[in-house]
Amino acid sequence: MNWLNQHKKAIILAASAAVFTAIMIFLATGKNKEPVKQAVPTETENTVVKQEANNDESNETIVIDIKGAVQHPGVYEMRTGDRVSQAIEKAGGTSEQADEAQVNLAEILQDGTVVYIPKKGEETAVQQGGGGSVQSDGGKGALVNINTATLEELQGISGVGPSKAEAIIAYREENGRFQTIEDITKVSGIGEKSFEKIKSSITVK
């Protein structure tokens, strides 16, 4: 007990020194630690990811039916983004009778569409569908795809004026694609009588 009293100050000083030393070591160690940096994707990495996504989309297979003045008419598998010119090439090219002036070779193909290459002198009102199809009903005139047709193309249908054409596009934008040609009767202003007049001129594919 006497020893503790005699050395009390020394013990307190030693303890204080130890605590002070520990604090200094802790502070020094904390300063040397670098903050953890979160990995941020670089612009190059983002570009690579976008390119891979685009490649996946372009690798999707579609099926088209090419008819008319080509070497090998038939059903062919194509890739998303392919154009009419590529479909013609896959069918062996056009025949000597082909009238390419009536065909939009740069048009993009859609799955399930018909590409028709007319012959020279053939009287067909060939119309280019918005999705890359060149559709024809055997020389009697082209069918208008009501899912892709523009305002002008819709007005080209006998019995469809500007107001009905606008109504068709408005319905399409609000409700999506027409599943059957009969669905057009759901459009305001187009009843059964109107449908009977236009059904032979329209398609949904």
Swiss-Prot record:
InterPro entries listed in its UniProt record: Competence_ComE, Competence_ComEA_HhH, Endo/Exo/Phosphatase_dom_1, Hlx-hairpin-Hlx_DNA-bd_motif, RuvA_2-like, Soluble_ligand-bd
* Entry keyword set: Cell membrane, Competence, Membrane, Repeat, Transmembrane, Transmembrane helix
Of the GO CC terms on this record, one is:
plasma membrane
SUPFAM superfamilies attached to this UniProt entry: RuvA domain 2-like
Record GO terms (molecular function): DNA binding
The record places the following residue ranges in the Extracellular compartment, namely: 29-205
Query: Could you list which ranges are Cytoplasmic topological domains?
Result: 1-9
The record's induction entry says: Expression activated by ComK.
Residues of the HhH domain: 142-171, 172-201
Q: Does the keyword Transmembrane apply?
A: yes
Please indicate which superkingdom the organism of origin belongs to.
Bacteria
Q: Where in the cell is it found?
A: Cell membrane
Please report the record's description of how this protein sits within the membrane. Answer: Single-pass type II membrane protein
Q: Which GO terms describe its biological process?
A: DNA repair; establishment of competence for transformation; protein secretion by the type II secretion system
Q: Which residues cross the membrane?
A: 10-28
Q: Which PANTHER family match?
A: ENDONUCLEASE/EXONUCLEASE/PHOSPHATASE FAMILY DOMAIN-CONTAINING PROTEIN 1 (PTHR21180), ENDONUCLEASE_EXONUCLEASE_PHOSPHATASE FAMILY DOMAIN-CONTAINING PROTEIN 1 (PTHR21180:SF32)
Record function comment = Needed for both DNA binding and transport. It is absolutely required for the uptake of transforming DNA but not for binding. Its role in binding may be indirect.
Protein name per Swiss-Prot or TrEMBL: ComE operon protein 1
